């Protein structure tokens, strides 16, 4: 009798999954919060696309453009529930993500190329350039703190936006790893007018940042005024030492 109940329950579960898979994508888009705007969706909840998607960040809209998605129902248990691909002009984002039963957010195999200008919607940083990120793994705890982060971020054609005109900085790479001491990263200069070397660390909610700045851009008056509250002068340029909690 127990085997019969098991097969009945399994059949019911499979039927529910198949029924869900056939639901149109428009059903899913109607369940999204107001901070996500979707137009012209097609396909199914299981695998579909939207002609244009934008999300609200700090009261401003960030365009994702065309978005395609594919659900992985068996990946829900391990935090790999969906693959998302978006394209908006030269901007593209490919990512696999999910939420574990414990509430941890997991991101893997993320490839991102975008104009870094969107950072200004989150932080008061007047910067420009192109951001390329290859994130192997990112885990964010249920409390919202990063627990694991591995990957590489490249900031190309970096510039500081000043009233008198942009200050060209260069191209920089950040290599990020995670071990028992927490998340750590190293910043290196590939080329440019600002020589930047540094490192950062994050464990729990405690962070530290240390960096040295030198080169022609470090002698630019507008740039010096911009970093005056963060950096102290040295013989070769400037030094930044920050620490605190998120």
Short names for language-model regions:
Residues 52-63, 90-97, 112-125, 137-145, ...:
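Flexible, membrane-facing loop/turn or short amphipathic-helix motifs
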Residues 15-40:
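Aromatic-capped interface at the extracytoplasmic side
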Residues 146-150, 208:
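Outer-membrane beta-barrel architecture
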Residues 38-125, 130-132:
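N-terminal beta-strand/beta-hairpin edge segment
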């Amino acid at each position: 009798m127990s085997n019969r109940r098991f097969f009945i329950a399994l059949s019911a579960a499979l039927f529910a999954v198949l029924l869900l898979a056939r639901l149109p994508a428009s059903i899913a888009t109607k369940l999204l919060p107001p901070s996500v705007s979707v137009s012209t969706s097609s396909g199914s909840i299981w695998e579909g696309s939207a002609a244009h998607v934008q999300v609200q960040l700090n009261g401003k809209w960030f365009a994702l453009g065309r978005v395609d998605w594919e659900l992985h129902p068996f990946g829900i248990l391990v935090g790999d529930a969906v693959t998302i691909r978006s394209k908006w002009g030269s901007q593209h984002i490919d990512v696999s993500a999910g939420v574990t039963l414990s509430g941890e957010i997991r991101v893997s195999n993320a490839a991102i190329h975008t104009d870094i200008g969107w950072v200004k919607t989150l932080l008061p940083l007047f910067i420009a350039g192109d951001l390329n990120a290859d994130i192997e793994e990112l885990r964010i705890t249920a409390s919202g703190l990063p627990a694991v982060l591995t990957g590489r971020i490249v900031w190309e054609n970096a510039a500081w936006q000043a009233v008198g005109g942009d200050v060209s900085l260069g191209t920089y790479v950040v290599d990020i790893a995670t071990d028992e001491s927490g998340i750590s990263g190293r910043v290196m200069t590939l080329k440019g007018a600002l020589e930047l070397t540094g490192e950062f660390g994050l464990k729990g909610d405690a962070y530290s940042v240390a960096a040295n700045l030198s080169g022609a851009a470090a002698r630019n008056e507008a740039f010096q005024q911009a970093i005056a509250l963060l950096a102290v002068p040295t013989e070769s340029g400037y030094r930044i030492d920050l620490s605190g909690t998120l």
